[in-house]
Amino acid sequence: MYQQPHTNVKTWRPVVLTAGLLFYTHPPANHIQIILKYITSMKQILTKITNGEVLTREQTCQIVRHIADGEYNDVQISALLTGLIMRGIKVDEVLGLRDGLIETGQPVDFSPYQVIDIVGTGGDNKNTFNISTCACFVVAGAGYKVAKHGNYAATSTSGASNVMEHHGVQFTADSNRLRRSMEACNFAYLHAPLFAHGMKAVAPVRKMLQIPTCFNLLGPLVNPCRPAYQLLGVANLNQMRLYSSVYEKLGIGYGIVNSIDGYDEISLTGNFKVKTNTMEKIFRPADLGLPTVRPEELYGGATPDEAAEIFDSVLENRSTESRKNVVLANAAFAIKVIERDKDIAECIAIARESLESGRALTCLKTYVELNNKNL
């Protein structure tokens, strides 16, 4: 018996792409207009991109809505992502994609708290230990509210989600449980795949392309709680310029850090640049009263278990001085983003007290205990 097919264009299998036209096997006659609507829409988008025109924030937001609703097929999404890669993505386009992912994702409300997220873009291929995740607990131990938005490792041995799972954390998207965690230990962990539904829709295409796309830039921008503050580590200065423009338009308190030798965090292996709402400066480790460290001292381990042991050693204040100092530096600049009037020496002292007093470790233990009890 004939059954009326639904109107999800993505399910109609493309058989040939030629002369700018995409043909499908036997689409229902009464759905021809739907096909033309989306092909025309994507054709207009791709024409703008190939002509060097910049899409508006609303246009790119609408693209994400269509992708999340399954209204574009994989060929169209692939063409879009490739076009943006070749032309280069612009600030308003990043903002629009970010808006769309936030809108189509699951929100988390931590108000009235003013929370901070500490995150790196990844992709620096340095395989460092979990510096930003350690810094999150140091900042939480100092009394600030931290909402860490993270995922499994992409290019390193262990990402934030790997470390959390090692400690028995069961990820949740339940706002009440996340809020109770924030209230109990100043920390909540937001496992990215549970929230960004739009990201799931492009995952197969990104996997097939096997090259970085504009969606690689969006991870740090789509924390579902929309933090008031963010410390972001980037791997190069071009990314620093792009993200700073995005943050300025979003109106949040930010700090962006880049180690000149390519780390997407403050590595203390040499000079590093910091850009905030009010300051842009190159620092030396000595400016913080800290020694320079060797790259091999930041090694993240060969296995997730080894990475978790390094993570624990830092928060238990039994790690090497180099690892400890790197975490203190990153935590201090996160505190500086929140406390603009404090100088960096004060912020380092606050971070050091949190770590050496055991308060950072207490935050971790409380968080894990609450999670394992399912709150």
Task: List each model region and its residues.
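N-terminal glycine-rich anion-binding loops that anchor highly charged ligand groups
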Residues: 41, 49-95, 102-110, 326
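Short, Lys/Arg-enriched N-terminal segments with co-localized hydrophobic residues
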Residues: 24-41
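Positively charged N-terminal leader segments that act as targeting/secretion signals
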Residues: 4-28
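Acidic, glycine-rich active-site loops and adjacent beta-strand->loop/helix elements
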Residues: 120-125, 150-156, 195, 260-261
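Active-site cofactor/substrate anionic-group-binding motifs, chiefly glycine-
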Residues: 88-150
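Glycine-rich anion-binding loops and their surrounding alpha/beta cores
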Residues: 48, 100-106, 128, 143, ...
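A glycine-rich phosphate/pyrophosphate-binding beta-strand-loop-alpha-helix module
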Residues: 81, 129-185
